[in-house]
């Protein structure tokens, strides 16, 4: 052990990671143990007024942002095109410095099949107070579309009276206002206000338990997705996915030109949780969208859904994102609550590939502090994972295979634990070799070298992959080309402090040029 102990890379909670039981693992965690240098979890930031400028985006990239999320529930196409341009400008401005350069991905978050209320007294900014116990009439009569008040509220979902029944709940504005349905007419229902408050215009409506039959992809979504293809976004976060057919519909809209865009399905209601397996099968990844989920299912059950979804994604080897309210209090305060710190750490311990910030970076007062805080918590949590048990279980559930790349990936991760390697270096074109390594959750960062920009950007969705973009011309001698890419990864790893001369790294390469031939693993001392 003394020899492995001198490899400074792996001191991070190593004693705990190799315990025999989970209880023993917890007993051995040590607050004075230094976390790993690399952070393995991806950080997704929503870009909005607080973070749109090139200057701010540069700082966010330096602080650790990997994926920029654009929320298409708000803003025009011009606005989002400007944001995308700024993100790319900020990313490329750091390209001259290969150490700081990170290929940042762009994600388009669709509005999805939302139900919204009408305008209060004809104005977008007016508010009325709803009093507990009062009666509120919900109407589908378009005469009230721009003329709602404390007595009558118009909603834009025409089948409302068919899907709710007396005793149903209707939630408005993220669950802040709740209404209890008393009686139902042909184009209206009478409700009692259970929870009052100030109601503004065009607020979101949730109908927990109702079988809402809205199209998965609205006409606005179709325009937004086509815009995304033109803008060359890397991934789509598809809102309110309820079944596999919804995912296929999004794929169809993306079409041939957008066939390489990753589709991450957002699970936000009971039906989505119930039909999780078919959705996972059809998607490239999953987002646990805890905001709407916490209204659609009881708040005390959200953590169960989170653990179940993360577990099934880890088992299937697909990326999973934990989102909503992770550091919510940092919208207004420079430090998170203790509960939020715990929440971020536990999402990482559960096995999330990425953690997301919404309002914290889009409209908050402390966007940079929020990114740095997530980065710091994630590093500590990653060191505290019970790697010994996790690797054995992941290896056990992975199907038997004759695919050389899969077999090599398992071997490489096992070897990386055995020799406490500073990193696993992999050369990849499509990204698949790196994704397979990520699936087995090595402690060491996976430095994935590729010439394909999109492969590099999408790799941020997977835990532990540190993508680097290799921009030199292809060498005519293939073996020389392999060596120059491996050396490039070594230089970056040393400059970033992942390892130093004399440490060992594991190198995965193919036996011939092209995609799909990765089958050679070498254990190499760092020069």
Swiss-Prot record:
Task: Write out the similarity annotation.
Answer: Belongs to the pyruvate kinase family.
- Its EC top class is transferase
Under the heading Pfam families, the entry gives:
PK (PF00224), PK_C (PF02887)
Instruction: Give the catalytic activity.
Output: pyruvate + ATP = phosphoenolpyruvate + ADP + H(+)
The subunit field of the Swiss-Prot or TrEMBL record says:
Homotetramer.
Annotated substrate binding sites: 69, 266, 291-292, 324
- Entry-linked NCBIfam families: PRK05826.1 (NF004491), PRK06354.1 (NF004978), pyruv_kin (TIGR01064)
Q: Which UniProt keywords apply?
A: ATP-binding, Glycolysis, Kinase, Magnesium, Metal-binding, Nucleotide-binding, Potassium, Pyruvate, Transferase
**What is the documented function of this protein?**
Glycolytic enzyme that catalyzes the transfer of a phosphoryl group from phosphoenolpyruvate (PEP) to ADP, generating ATP.
Question: Could you tell me what this protein is called?
Answer: Pyruvate kinase PKM
Annotated site, Transition state stabilizer, chain positions: 266
Question: Which residues does the annotation say bind K(+)?
Answer: 71, 73, 109-110
Residues at which ATP binds: 71-74, 116, 203
Gene3D superfamilies per the UniProt record, alphabetical:
Phosphoenolpyruvate-binding domains, PK beta-barrel domain-like, Pyruvate kinase, C-terminal domain
Determine if S-adenosyl-L-methionine is one of this entry's keywords.
no
Q: Which GO terms describe its cellular component?
A: cytoplasm
Q: In which pathway does it act?
A: Carbohydrate degradation; glycolysis; pyruvate from D-glyceraldehyde 3-phosphate: step 5/5
A single Gene Ontology MF term assigned here is:
magnesium ion binding
Q: Quick one: which residues bind beta-D-fructose 1,6-bisphosphate?
A: 428-433, 478, 485, 512-517
Its required cofactor(s), as named, are: Mg(2+); K(+)
Where along the chain is Mg(2+) bound?
268, 292
Instruction: List GO BP terms, alphabetically.
Output: cellular response to insulin stimulus; glycolytic process
Q: Does the keyword Transferase apply?
A: yes
State the EC number(s): 2.7.1.40
């Amino acid at each position: 052990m003394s020899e492995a102990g001198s490899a400074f890379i792996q001191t991070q909670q190593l004693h705990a990671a190799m315990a025999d039981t989970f209880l023993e693992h917890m007993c051995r965690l040590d607050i004075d143990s230094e976390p790993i240098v690399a952070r393995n979890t991806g950080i997704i930031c929503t870009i909005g007024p607080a973070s749109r400028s090139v200057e701010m985006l540069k700082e966010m990239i330096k602080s650790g942002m990997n994926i920029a999320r654009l929320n298409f529930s708000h803003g025009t196409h011009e606005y989002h095109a400007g944001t995308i341009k700024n993100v790319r400008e900020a990313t490329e401005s750091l390209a001259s410095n290969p150490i700081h350069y990170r290929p940042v991905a762009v994600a388009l978050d669709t509005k999805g099949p939302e139900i919204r209320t009408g305008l209060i007294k004809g104005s977008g900014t007016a508010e009325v107070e709803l009093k507990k116990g009062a009666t509120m009439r919900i109407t589908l009569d378009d005469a009230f579309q721009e003329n709602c008040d404390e007595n009558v509220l118009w909603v834009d979902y025409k089948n409302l009276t068919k899907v709710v029944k007396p005793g149903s709940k209707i939630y408005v504005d993220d669950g802040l206002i709740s209404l209890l349905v008393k009686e139902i007419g042909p184009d209206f229902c009478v409700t009692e206000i259970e929870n009052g408050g100030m109601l503004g215009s065009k607020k979101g409506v949730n109908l927990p338990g109702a079988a809402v039959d809205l199209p998965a992809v609205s006409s606005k979504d179709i325009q937004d997705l086509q815009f995304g293809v033109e803008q060359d976004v890397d991934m789509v976060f598809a809102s309110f996915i309820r079944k596999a057919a919804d995912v296929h519909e999004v794929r169809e809209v993306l079409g041939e030109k957008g066939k390489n865009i990753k589709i991450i399905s957002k699970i936000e209601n009971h039906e989505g949780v119930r039909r999780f397996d078919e959705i996972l099968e059809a998607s490239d990844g999953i987002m646990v969208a805890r905001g709407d989920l916490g209204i659609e299912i009881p708040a005390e059950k959200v953590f169960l859904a989170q653990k179940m979804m993360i577990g099934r994604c880890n088992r299937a080897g697909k990326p999973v994102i934990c989102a909503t309210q992770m550091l919510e209090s940092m919208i207004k305060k420079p430090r998170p609550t203790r509960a939020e710190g715990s929440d971020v750490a536990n999402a990482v311990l559960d096995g999330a590939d990425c953690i997301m910030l919404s309002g914290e970076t889009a409209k908050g007062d402390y966007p940079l502090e929020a990114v740095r805080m997530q980065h710091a918590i994630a590093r500590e949590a990653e060191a505290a994972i019970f790697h010994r048990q996790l690797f054995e279980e992941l290896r056990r559930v992975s199907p038997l295979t004759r695919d050389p790349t899969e077999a090599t990936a398992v071997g490489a991760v096992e070897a990386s634990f055995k020799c406490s390697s500073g990193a696993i270096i992999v050369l990849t074109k499509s990204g698949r070799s790196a994704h397979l390594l990520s699936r087995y959750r090595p402690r060491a960062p996976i430095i994935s070298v590729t010439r394909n920009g999109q492969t590099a950007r999408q790799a941020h969705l997977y835990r532990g992959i540190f993508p680097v973009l290799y921009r030199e011309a292809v060498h005519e001698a293939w073996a020389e080309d392999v060596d120059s890419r491996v050396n490039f990864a070594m230089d970056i790893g040393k400059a970033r402090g992942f390892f130093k001369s004399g440490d060992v790294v594991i190198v995965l390469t193919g036996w011939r040029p092209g995609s799909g031939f990765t089958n050679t693993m070498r254990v190499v001392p760092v020069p």
